[in-house]
């Protein structure tokens, strides 16, 4: 099982954690949402939960809860700039369909 990050995503997360001044890493998870069933969740982690799995890539810890891991295994977190827009992009090999707006997916 693995979760990886692109260079640009790792640099962005490191910047966020440095500016925040604390935190173990970044939580990547899923929640029920949207027209396709699931949406990604990103949040800072200060304390690990019992079922958390920790991945480290390029010096950044990515924490995934046990329930989300089955949907996220093999995902690469990227940070992209397209025109005036920028944000995290999830390259998830488990996704079967995405909604038209790109906010939710199913596996």
UniProtKB/Swiss-Prot annotation:
Disulfide bridge partners, by residue number: none
Gene3D superfamilies associated with the record: HesB-like domain
Keyword Transit peptide part of the UniProt annotation: no
Keywords from the UniProt entry: Iron, Metal-binding
Cofactor info, note text: Binds 2 iron ions per dimer. The dimer may bind additional iron ions.
One GO cellular component, as annotated: cytosol
Residues where Fe cation binds: 35, 99, 101
Single Gene Ontology MF annotation: 2 iron, 2 sulfur cluster binding
The protein's required cofactors: Fe cation
Subunit structure: Homodimer; may form tetramers and higher multimers.
Similarity comment: Belongs to the HesB/IscA family.
Name listed for the protein in its UniProt record: Iron-binding protein IscA
Organism: Edwardsiella ictaluri (strain 93-146)
Gene of this entry: iscA
């Amino acid at each position: 099982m693995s979760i990886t990050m692109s260079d640009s995503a790792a640099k962005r997360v490191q910047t966020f954690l440095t500016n925040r001044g604390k935190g173990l890493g970044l939580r990547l998870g899923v929640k029920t949402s949207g027209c396709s069933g699931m949406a990604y969740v990103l949040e800072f982690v200060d304390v690990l939960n019992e079922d958390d799995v920790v991945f480290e890539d390029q010096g950044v810890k990515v924490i995934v809860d046990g329930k989300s891991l089955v949907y996220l295994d093999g995902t690469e977190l990227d940070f992209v700039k397209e025109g005036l827009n920028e944000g995290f992009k999830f390259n998830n090999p488990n996704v079967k369909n995405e909604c038209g707006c790109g906010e939710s997916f199913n596996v």
